[in-house]
């Protein structure tokens, strides 16, 4: 049986509180790497250590608690619960935390306070993604994992969502790890990893960081 190596020779270190971008074309392995960091998938060799804890040494119950307490996930598809309001969707995330953020303050930060009682079907794509981010961040996770969070949005709405992720990173101090194929987005990152064919080809600290609102593509 021929095995395909999706990732090979990966070695990366991310500092607490950094805005980090994993950049690469489709099929480069960036989403798989994000899933391994998030303990959704597992590597055949090597390990992920977050705050010194190796996820491969945890049993399933420990992993579940670890994901709940320390990780937040934002995907290209919003995955909101259709029969719950904006507030209720965010509350789902709050229930998973011992130390959730204040929901009213968070909705104001997200720019969706006036949409609190609406259902997902009544929202624009950008409003749905803001709600999805709210559900992920209300847990106050150490790390926010974002897989193509602007992939389904137009460029103006994309920049609004990126500005929101930037604001959250600065306000709450969460480490943000974002997967994207959009080369321009790397300019807002503190640290950039460029992937190609399952390998990290570039790894650098961005000395000329640009505000999300000033990104151009």
Question: Which residues fall in each region the model found?
Answer:
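ABC family nucleotide-binding domain
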Residues: 1-188, 192
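Conserved beta-strand-loop-alpha-helix hinge in the C-terminal portion
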Residues: 199-217
């Amino acid at each position: 049986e021929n095995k395909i190596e999706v990732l090979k020779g990966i070695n990366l270190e991310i500092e607490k509180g950094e805005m980090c971008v994993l950049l690469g074309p489709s099929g480069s392995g960036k989403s798989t790497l994000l899933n391994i960091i998030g303990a959704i998938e597992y590597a055949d060799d090597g390990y992920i250590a977050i705050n010194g804890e190796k996820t491969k040494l945890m049993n399933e119950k420990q992993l579940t608690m670890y994901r709940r307490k320390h990780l937040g996930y934002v995907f290209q598809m919003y995955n909101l619960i259709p029969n719950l309001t904006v507030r209720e969707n965010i509350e789902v995330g709050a229930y998973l935390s011992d130390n959730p953020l204040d929901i009213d303050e968070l909705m104001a930060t997200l720019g969706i306070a006036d949409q609190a009682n609406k259902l997902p079907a009544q929202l624009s794509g950008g409003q749905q993604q803001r709600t999805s981010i709210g559900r992920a961040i209300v847990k106050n996770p150490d790390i926010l994992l974002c897989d193509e969070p602007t992939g389904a949005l137009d460029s103006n709405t994309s920049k609004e969502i990126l500005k929101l992720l930037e604001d959250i990173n600065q306000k709450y101090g969460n480490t943000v790890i974002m997967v994207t194929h959009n080369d321009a987005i790397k300019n807002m990152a503190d640290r950039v990893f460029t992937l190609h064919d399952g390998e990290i080809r570039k790894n650098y600290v961005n000395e000329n960081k640009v505000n999300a609102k000033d990104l151009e593509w």
